[in-house]
């Protein structure tokens, strides 16, 4: 399975005109919420989520090591911007490039920093099903709200293997389980069968075939929650009425943009929401236009999360960061040092 998040952000991203909409959401404001299914497990899940970057130190003796102090700063920023929750150590969070011990540290630090102000989903997928189950139990012990996983990666490329993989992980804890669908075409008659498994109650859908998704949803035998995972397609997904929110990479950089998309879609004000979706598309377009943009862009808002780990990323130079800064300046809607101003 190809889990390259960039492939799923890039398709459909287009440069659009500047709309001049700087987003500063106030989490204390009474806002409209996208609907969620009935049931306690779905309470408080509606809205925009960041697939959180896993922060590392940049430079010095700790270069590339997990930066837990930055995790606390990220959490505070996301709370202030009105995000609903965080999705940890998935594709954006470089889960497969972290050790199990590092992933557990991320879960624990996020939960203790959030203090119940953000919902937390831990992606626990590993190459080995057994390792995934062990990590799921560690995540549950850390206090996360849900666990999640991609289908088998590299090995186990069959529906039967994926079913067994999900069965084992979802039964490893009593927490609700969120399928992470990315990289393969959704086959309604097959995919719906995942929802017959214990504790499987939702999906992060990083795809664009809303027809097949709808066909699958009509076959569900129990309530389930869905999140749009392709940043540049969030509003398209919300317009189908199938999604309760979004989980994405660039929600880290411009969280208020996605908060506004969800709020306005909940009010059925899609014309206003489209202006914020244009911000998303322009930011995603910059991500693919400038070398080293991914993750290093967080320096612009004052939250340096370090370089992506090899082989996913090669450390950037000061000159390359200057190009990233120039590209974000040109967008006109991202406030420099927003997290510390």
Where are these regions (language model features)?
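Conserved short secondary-structure transition element at the edge of the structured enzyme core
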Residues: 239, 279-312
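Structural motif
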Residues: 11, 81, 142, 172, ...
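N-terminal secretory signal peptides and thylakoid transit peptides that target proteins
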Residues: 1-16
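Active-site beta->alpha loop and helix N-cap motifs at the rims of alpha/beta catalytic domains
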Residues: 42, 56-182
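Catalytic alpha/beta core domains of metabolic enzymes, predominantly
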Residues: 183-279, 287
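Structural preference for beta-strand elements that scaffold enzyme active sites
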Residues: 47-49, 85, 119-121, 146, ...
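C-terminal segment of N-terminal export signals and the immediately downstream linker at the start
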Residues: 23-51, 61
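Conserved, mostly hydrophobic/aromatic
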Residues: 60, 78, 110, 169, ...
């Amino acid at each position: 399975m190809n889990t390259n998040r960039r492939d799923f952000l890039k398709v459909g991203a287009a440069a659009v005109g500047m709309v001049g909409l700087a987003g500063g959401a106030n989490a204390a404001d009474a806002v409209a919420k996208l609907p969620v299914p009935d049931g306690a497990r779905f309470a408080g899940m509606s809205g925009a989520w960041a697939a959180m970057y896993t922060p590392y130190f940049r430079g010095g003796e700790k270069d590339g090591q997990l930066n837990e102090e930055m995790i606390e700063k990220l959490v505070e920023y996301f709370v202030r911007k009105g995000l609903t929750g965080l999705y940890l150590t998935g594709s954006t969070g470089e889960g497969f490039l972290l050790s199990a011990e590092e992933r557990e540290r991320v879960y624990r630090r996020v939960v203790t920093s959030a203090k119940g102000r953000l919902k937390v989903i831990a992606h626990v997928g590993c190459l080995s099903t057994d390792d995934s189950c062990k990590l799921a139990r560690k995540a549950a012990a850390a206090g996360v709200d849900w666990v999640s996983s991609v289908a088998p990666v590299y090995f186990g490329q069959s529906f039967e293997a994926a079913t067994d993989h999900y069965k084992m992980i979802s039964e490893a804890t009593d927490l609700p389980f969120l399928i992470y669908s990315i990289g393969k075409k959704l086959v309604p008659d097959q995919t719906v069968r995942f929802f017959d498994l214990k504790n499987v109650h939702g999906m992060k859908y990083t795809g664009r075939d809303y027809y097949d998704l709808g066909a699958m949803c009509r076959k569900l035998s129990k309530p389930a929650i869905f999140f749009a995972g392709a940043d540049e397609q969030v509003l398209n997904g919300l317009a189908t009425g199938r999604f309760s929110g979004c989980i994405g990479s660039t929600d880290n950089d411009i969280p208020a943009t996605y908060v506004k998309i969800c709020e306005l879609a909940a009010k059925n004000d899609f014309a206003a929401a489209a202006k914020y979706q244009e911000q998303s598309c322009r930011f995603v377009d910059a991500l693919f236009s400038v070398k080293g943009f991914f993750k290093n862009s967080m320096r612009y808002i004052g939250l340096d999360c370090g370089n992506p780990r090899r082989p996913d990323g090669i450390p950037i130079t000061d000159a390359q960061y200057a190009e990233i800064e120039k590209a974000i300046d040109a967008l006109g809607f991202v406030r420099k040092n927003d997290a510390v101003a």
